[in-house]
From Swiss-Prot:
It is found in: Cytoplasm. It comes from the Bacteria. Participates in chromosomal partition during cell division. May act via the formation of a condensin-like complex containing Smc and ScpA that pull DNA away from mid-cell into both cell halves. GO terms for cellular component: cytoplasm. Homodimer. Homodimerization may be required to stabilize the binding of ScpA to the Smc head domains. Component of a cohesin-like complex composed of ScpA, ScpB and the Smc homodimer, in which ScpA and ScpB bind to the head domain of Smc. The presence of the three proteins is required for the association of the complex with DNA. Keywords: Cell cycle, Cell division, Chromosome partition, Cytoplasm. It comes from Bacillus cereus (strain G9842). PANTHER family: SEGREGATION AND CONDENSATION PROTEIN B (PTHR34298:SF2). NCBIfam families: SMC-Scp complex subunit ScpB. This is Segregation and condensation protein B. Belongs to the ScpB family. One of its GO terms (biological process) is DNA replication. InterPro entries: ScpB_csome_segregation, WH-like_DNA-bd_sf, WH_DNA-bd_sf. Pfam families: SMC_ScpB (PF04079).
Amino acid sequence: MDRKEQKSIIEGLLFVSGDEGIYPEQIAKVLEIEMNEVMNILEEMQQECEGANRGLQIVQYAKVYRFATKKEHASYYQKLIDTPTAASLSQAALETLAIVAYRQPITRTEMEEIRGVKTDKALQTLVSHLLIKEMGRAEGPGRPILYGTTKEFLDTFGLKTLDDLPPLSEENEQMNEADLFFGSLQEISK
């Protein structure tokens, strides 16, 4: 196997090892090559990644090698993290979000009754995107969690307050909340 292929494989190993990284000994074992050769290849790859036209670098922490983003690009990564988008949400999550937006505070069971399917995964996604949060507990058996939208929800969808959501007219009350919400989002984003 030539040097180019070895680098390619090591690059893949670094990628799949993720944040945990990979020991050079593991690379040597996988590629069936000597440790000094692994170290030489890693050093070459580190130098190649130092160029200004590369977004990743290979770093060593506690004897483990892994990919990391470059510090000088941190402000761009932060912008991405700070702006969750509706495009990254599944259809189920968007439908659930619309229900929460119009019916908050609302329990998971109430959402499932409206949607007709389980909402566990959609709720986890919305909470992790900081678009909804726990607002307290409902009275009654089991004291279920009540969910509502967050400031991040308003920011993400360009709303100042929940009053900026399109009103549910008598005609629209028959319409699925999700359909109405998606329509309103298209209007807001124009």
